[in-house]
Amino acid sequence: MKRLWVIGCGLWLSCMLSHALVPIEKPTLSEPTGIAPAYFGPNAFPVVEMLDGRTSSTLDVELAGEGYIGYHSNNTVNLFARVHVPLFTRWANITLWMPVYGWYDQYDGKGSGAGDVYISTDIQILHNEWFKTPKAKYIPQMTVRAALKTASGEQFDRRRHYDCPGYFFDLSMGQSIPLKQVTLRLAGSAGFLCWQTDNGRQNDAVMYGLQAALRHEYVSLQATWGGYFGWEQYGDRPMTVKARVAGHVKGFEPYIQYQYGIKDYPFHQLRVGLIYHIAILKNRNTPSNPNNEQ
């Protein structure tokens, strides 16, 4: 019994000493953390690809290769994957994406590692098909999205990924305008984004985006401008523009995309990928077009 008492006292003392050696400091909000996209690799927390006001009625499986040329000798090559899954209806999706693995060459040498996993729930909250009036075609489509970023990305010590979770919510709205042989799609989005930084702090940001797309039966063109405003104002306000060309043949969608970092995202990006649309909701009031063009 005496031996157990001595062991218990020893464990209690070691716990007290271990806690005493870990200082808990009050956050200094006036000092920026530097945990921001301008000072990390291209996959740390990039500008999120915006929705265009619609969810998907198909199971979409995407695989791509992408390269980043840094403005300051920071070059990266990634394998990228994404999947959209309808939740038994075209009006709600689960989306999962990540840079599966990347190889990089930066100022302090070469390396490689896995990236962060993102998962989102995308819900249609407004659609013109829900209204049976002659002017229903003028009603825009709207979606809300809630997403989580994991802390699975590797090599925080070499400034490749944040060693912390994050999340964002956004609202997107879009409208299709039929022209002679093409459809013009205009969309906008706004939201809130947050990620943990250090010493119990977090960075909050306002998201924004505008998009214009032209869709023909076999090809589509898309241009997007977007970014977010972090509150620290220290490398945390990335702004980018993207141009995308895609083909559409029997459920397959090969594409090529270029992205240019205007501010706080010092990279050129080139992505080449393929999306396969699988109709898994047949005979459930889904459109025949796999990309839901209205």
Residue ranges and their predicted role:
Residues M1-A36, L281-Q294:
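Cleavable N-terminal export/targeting peptides
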Residues A20-T150, D157, C164-S172, Y218-W231, ...:
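Transmembrane beta-barrel domains of Gram-negative outer membranes and organellar outer membranes
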Residues N78, R215, N292-Q294:
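Exposed, low-structure sequence patches enriched in small/polar residues
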Residues Y118-T121, V245-V249, P266-Q294:
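Outer-membrane beta-barrel "beta-signal"
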Residues Q124, G174-S176, I275-H277:
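Solvent-exposed residues in well-ordered beta-strands and their adjoining turns
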Residues A136, H161-Y162, G188, P287-Q294:
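Short intrinsically disordered coil segments
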Residues T150-F156, W195-D198:
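Short, well-ordered, mixed-charge alpha-helical segments that flank or form enzyme active sites
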Residues Y162-G230, M239-T240:
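Detector for outer-membrane/organellar transmembrane beta-barrel domains
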